[in-house]
Amino acid sequence: MNPISTLTLASLIILTLPITTTLLQNNKTNCFLYITKTAVTYAFVISLIPTLLFVQSNQEAYISNWHWMTIHTLKLSLSFKLDFFSLTFMPIALFITWSIMEFSLWYMHSDPHINRFFKYLLLFLITMLILVSANNLLQLFMGWEGVGIMSFLLISWWHGRTDANTAALQAMLYNRIGDMGFIMMMAWFIIHLNSWEFQQIFLTNPKNTTLPLLGLLLASTGKSAQFGLHPWLPSAMEGPTPVSALLHSSTMVMAGVFTLIRFYPLMENNLTVQTSTLCLGAITTLFTAICALTQNDIKKIIALSTSSQLGLMMVTIGINQPHLAFTHMCTHAFFKAMLFLSSGSIIHNLDNEQDIRKMGGLYKTMPITSTAIIIGSLALTGMPFLTGFYSKDPIIETANMSYINTWALLVTLIAVSMTASYSTRIIFFALLGQPRYPTLTRINENNPHLVNPIKRLILGSIFMGFFISMNTIPHTTPQMTMPPHLKFMALAVTLLGFTVATELNNMTHNLMFKQPSRMYTFSTTLGYYPTTTHRILPYLSLTMSQNLATTIMDSIWLEKMIPKNLTTMQKTAASLVSNQKGLMKLYFLSFLLSITLGLLIAL
């Protein structure tokens, strides 16, 4: 085994050690928390070495020493694929999880089950690393389902709250819809290629792969909360803030986009799937950006921004730039985790207040958190020379020079401008102006478990974009010349969004409207989608089921089939065996005539 595979396995083994210690002894002390955090830290440091070796040598590695089973001609083995994608993403996921775990020591310190919470976070990370490094579809599916079940357990962490249980159930059900597409893809490959190994699938490169790739797109739509299967993502904010930070930055929602990137050798020549991915991503990034403009919950605004950025990654995959989408996925992880941790700092200090209208003036009382939110918001909008700029600006430039689907380009540009608008809105309402929270609120930003993770992520949000983009190899011929108006398009729409949002916030800060407009209601209710899918459609289906049950069971079976049918049968049988016809009037008339004739004869 070469150093890359050896050190990668060492980092994975280190992560499993805290899990095995819980099987040997009952960890009810806080030592387990620090053991887990230290294990993630050591795994991060060790994982940097294989990444640096890969950057130097540019040689992939495969580990396939563990044979599992053989079913007829199908050989199943446990194998790891250590290429550019996995070796780049693993240190990022470990670094962010390390920061989130340290933040959780402060945020969740009063939780009586904090040891189990750390165990769940660690399992969440391990399942994502299994997905990233998988070399076959079976192992990928194990990681895929692993992040799904861990997200369910973590979103419903505060299971005493009905909203948390409902949100976890939503996440599970929407992902079950996507999993049908994943299983369909696995079935297609096992029927037509008799293999789940990535090397054999990519080398064979079958021609008609539209059906399995559409199944993969459906799976990614559910996992990455694209339009149609997106309502679970804002609802998932019912979980603790560290869960939201890990779920949105480097685990659950990134799994769908990463799987599409992994299958780019099959997608790059399939125009049907590429166009579907492009249009789906464009609709998602615009729709969620519109919904984020009018939300007042700070966590939901950041959650909808995640969905919008995932749509932007899908657009990038749709224009056949998977490496650029992966770069944006890596850079996005830093500032998105920082935004969630900063919002968690504000929420915790303001006694669980999440409404940005009840904040204000926090730049004076929480300077480090305010700095992190400003830097994270600027990086999210693609401000030059921050982390987001090195991935978002090339995406817009590539889309401008692409020859496919101008409609999707225009929609994406509008969404990029709206990103600047809702980022400005967070800064304006939460950080600036006069304080709007209770005067006796106790705010403390001096805990090192709070400050140190945010500081590390601030550095990552400033510098890591440069290093990641420098080591991303372009796989298409770059444009040597570009018109200036296209070159500065991304910066122009971002500045437009900043300007419009600032002016509107200043103009309407003290205004009150009596009746919301239809567009405002459309945005605040997330396009009526949750109302339609979670209320109207279930009500209609239940009503129809009740009517059918009433008609079939009560009217047909219980009323007509048994009582009325028995009555009809008995009446028919009685009329057949009896000579009485039941004509009472005729009987009385004949009786009357007989009496009358008898009397006349007697007289």
UniProtKB/Swiss-Prot annotation:
Domain of life: Eukaryota
Reaction equations catalysed: a ubiquinone + NADH + 5 H(+)(in) = a ubiquinol + NAD(+) + 4 H(+)(out)
GO biological process, alphabetically ordered: electron transport coupled proton transport; mitochondrial electron transport, NADH to ubiquinone; mitochondrial respiratory chain complex I assembly
Topology of the protein relative to the lipid bilayer: Multi-pass membrane protein
Ranges that cross the membrane: 4-24, 35-55, 84-104, 121-141, 177-197, 213-233, 241-261, 273-293, 301-320, 325-347, 366-386, 413-433, 457-477, 480-500, 583-603
GO cellular component: mitochondrial inner membrane
EC number: 7.1.1.2
Physiological role: Core subunit of the mitochondrial membrane respiratory chain NADH dehydrogenase (Complex I) which catalyzes electron transfer from NADH through the respiratory chain, using ubiquinone as an electron acceptor. Essential for the catalytic activity and assembly of complex I.
Protein name (Swiss-Prot/TrEMBL): NADH-ubiquinone oxidoreductase chain 5
